[in-house]
Amino acid sequence: MSRIGKQPVPVPAGVDVNIDGQNISVKGSKGTLELTVSEPISVSRNDDGAIVVTRPDDERRNRSLHGLSRTLIANLVTGVTQGYTTKMEIFGVGYRVVAKGSNLEFALGYSHPVLIEAPEGITFAVETPTKFSISGIDKQKVGQISANIRRLRRPDPYKGKGIRYEGEQIRRKVGKTGK
């Protein structure tokens, strides 16, 4: 058995879970999320109201889908109750971010400003010109937008300039020495 897959997903009060075959819909105070589970995996509710994920056999593919499906369902429940937030920092002279409505405008040393539009369900918050956060209920969307923004100006291993996650340690390299 998968150590993660066999654990039931607790459903807190105020969260409504609707299971229709392979489709799962979770509704909470922050919104609604839906997920379609892969075919051999089955999802049901137990006596305490928790969500239980089961697999038909111990085939390799089914074992891997078992833990994955359970974690994705747990992410849905967490998303509609607490939501997800990623905090990011900008390092570098002249590098900054400004909120333009619901979008972000970056000055990253290019000859033009870079505009990032907020997709549906994602909100941006700028704390200082070098610190901002990305929030939403869908963990995958929040992580993907964060990765896309980081990709605009990856942290430089020599000087440490660029966009990074808050608390991320950049592996620094020593520059070449002159004679």
From Swiss-Prot:
One of its GO terms (molecular function) is structural constituent of ribosome. One of its GO terms (biological process) is cytoplasmic translation. Keywords: Ribonucleoprotein, Ribosomal protein, RNA-binding, rRNA-binding. SUPFAM superfamilies: Ribosomal protein L6. InterPro entries: Ribosomal_uL6-like, Ribosomal_uL6-like_a/b-dom_sf, Ribosomal_uL6_a/b-dom, Ribosomal_uL6_bac-type, Ribosomal_uL6_CS. GO terms for cellular component: cytosolic large ribosomal subunit. Pfam families: Ribosomal_L6. Part of the 50S ribosomal subunit. HAMAP family: Ribosomal_uL6_B. NCBIfam families: L6_bact. This protein binds to the 23S rRNA, and is important in its secondary structure. It is located near the subunit interface in the base of the L7/L12 stalk, and near the tRNA binding site of the peptidyltransferase center. Belongs to the universal ribosomal protein uL6 family. This is Large ribosomal subunit protein uL6. It comes from Mycobacteroides abscessus (strain ATCC 19977 / DSM 44196 / CCUG 20993 / CIP 104536 / JCM 13569 / NCTC 13031 / TMC 1543 / L948). The gene is rplF.
